[in-house]
Amino acid sequence: MTYQHIYNIIKKKAYFDAHQAVLIAVSGGVDSMNLLHFLHAFQAKLQIRIGIAHVNHKQRPESDDEEAYLRSWAKKHAIPIYVAYFQGAFSENAARHLRYQFFEEIMQQEHYSALVTAHHADDQAETILMRLIRGSRLRHLAGIREVQPFANGQLIRPFLTVSKAELPNPFHFEDHSNDSMAYFRNRVRHHYLPDFKRENPQATQSLIDLSAESRLLLQAFDDLTKGLEFHRLNCFLAQSAAVQFFLLQHYLETFPQLAIKKSQFDDLLHIIRRQKQGIYPIKNTYCLLIEKESFAIKKIIPKTDLNREFKMVSYGDSLNYRGYRFVFSGSLTDKGHDIAIPLYSLSPVTLRHRQAGDRLFLGEFSKKLRRLFIDGKFTSEQRQNAIVGEQAGVIIFVLVGDETYLRKASKHDIMLAKLYIDKLEKR
């Protein structure tokens, strides 16, 4: 396929109609060099001016050669170029974070309204297969979007409907790390996807079609629920369980820094359905706030009293909290610990102060903590310093004075782990 054919496809989609200054992410590989040559050749017809953004990851001997070539090319064609350098311990996630942070900074500083990357149809198919293997949610099977908000403008992927085989072969640098089986994407590209294509020669297109259909399904759901006041508990709970599930998923998508596991999602949904007022920590200083008539996810401001109200310990982790050390362990051996709390779930354990209305299930009945403290003849100071532990919004233990009260387990519960508690002054 020639650049003219690609231009004809892209022009119909009007990617650049709202943009004048476009920043191109260029690595020096064949895909990004195709993008650079294409946009340089057609910038007048598209009525845009272009700039180059390049990140030298300093991981290969060729990295400096790639940078030098791109600088020379940019100078020859009078195109501005911006270069960043990776420092510190290298990982794919860290490198990606640096790249997009750098792109965002350049867009804002140099007034570019669009970032353009060279993702193509094969990248889309690989991404969908990777997410299927990882067990991603349906929402994430929608794959890579052609256009999405980014920084002060948009991120555009104009080659996303074009296969790699349809692109020309301009001068480019080969990144031999693309052949390393140490990377998941390379294993998908060189092994897993070819195996699928031997079974079904149209496997790549089938994955792309799955992505498009998933995107349409999600768009239909969003259209049908638009304007729904789902933050109001009576509105949320009036929906079917299936609609509640996707409403909460959609809401969580508005918090990109809050990537939670499926088990945590199930816990949040369970807490909302119980309608018990309170503050439930999630992660990264985010919490679920349930009030009398509504719920919301909030980011807690550091150094506030609210932030000191609770801590959360996850499976395999430990932390110190108000004079005690808490260890969430899969080991069921109690030896050497002051207290051992049996756990029948691997959900994170929230440690907090008592709240008005707190109840502990004791078997055939439950008791308010206020009454529990009165019956136990605990002092006002002991009541104030009591530690409440809960999972998924259910209190599982109360530590007050020298006593520990446990939630009565069901006969069907299976112990999966223990929470070990030790007084710090013993350490």
UniProtKB/Swiss-Prot annotation:
GO terms for molecular function: ATP binding; tRNA(Ile)-lysidine synthase activity. The keyword Ligase applies. The N-terminal region contains the highly conserved SGGXDS motif, predicted to be a P-loop motif involved in ATP binding. Its main location: cytoplasm. Ligates lysine onto the cytidine present at position 34 of the AUA codon-specific tRNA(Ile) that contains the anticodon CAU, in an ATP-dependent manner. Cytidine is converted to lysidine, thus changing the amino acid specificity of the tRNA from methionine to isoleucine. Keywords: ATP-binding, Cytoplasm, Ligase, Nucleotide-binding, tRNA processing. One of its GO terms (cellular component) is cytoplasm. Belongs to the tRNA(Ile)-lysidine synthase family. GO terms for biological process: tRNA modification. InterPro entries: Lysidine-tRNA-synth_C, Rossmann-like_a/b/a_fold, TilS/TtcA_N, tRNA_Ile_lys_synt, tRNA_Ile_lys_synt_N. It is found in: Cytoplasm. ATP binds at S27, G28, G29, V30, D31, S32. Its EC number is 6.3.4.19. Gene3D superfamilies: HUPs (3.40.50.620). PANTHER family: TRNA(ILE)-LYSIDINE SYNTHASE-RELATED. This is tRNA(Ile)-lysidine synthase. It catalyses: cytidine(34) in tRNA(Ile2) + L-lysine + ATP = lysidine(34) in tRNA(Ile2) + AMP + diphosphate + H(+). The keyword Ribosomal protein does not apply. CDD domains: TilS_N (cd01992).
